[in-house]
Amino acid sequence: LATQVFCRVHVDDIVAGVIAGLDGPPGAYNLADDYPCSQNRVIEAACDLAGAAWPPLQSLEAANLSPMALAFYAENRRVVNGKAKRLLGWKPAYPTYVEGLRAVSAITSPAIASAPPAPASNVQR
């Protein structure tokens, strides 16, 4: 699947694009990141962020995918977002999958405390 690429988009960027579109010229707009890449690369980057090993690669035949999934992976899904940028002034806050994965990782990773917790107080507010 290394040759099959597609674009992604962070939910925050979708919301920003929809809001920009409310005041923009009528029309259809593509909201996508600026860096289409393979699913393998995204999985590898996610594993790297999580400190996990990359999963073994599997052929499409061995994956036992549905006909719909096979059709999806048979094509490239590059999306151009230039119209939204030009006419709506939209700019993705997460221009590549890397920034998106880092944002998700930041909200799902446990915080590391640098000091012990403060003692509980008996005072009610």
Which residue stretches match the model-derived regions?
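Mid/C-terminal beta-alpha module of Rossmann-like enzyme folds, strongest
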Residues: 14-69
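Conserved C-terminal active-site "lid" loop/helix of NAD(P)H-dependent oxidoreductases
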Residues: 11, 44, 63-91
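Substrate-positioning beta->alpha
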Residues: 1-21
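Amphipathic terminal alpha-helices
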Residues: 95-125
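Residues in well-ordered alpha-helical elements
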Residues: 12, 40, 82, 95-98
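Residues within well-ordered alpha-helical secondary structure of globular protein domains
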Residues: 20, 48, 90, 103-107
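Generic structural signal for individual residues within well-ordered alpha-helical segments
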Residues: 15, 43, 85, 98-101
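Residue-level signal for the nucleotide or nucleotide-sugar donor/cofactor binding architecture
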Residues: 6-9, 37, 79, 95
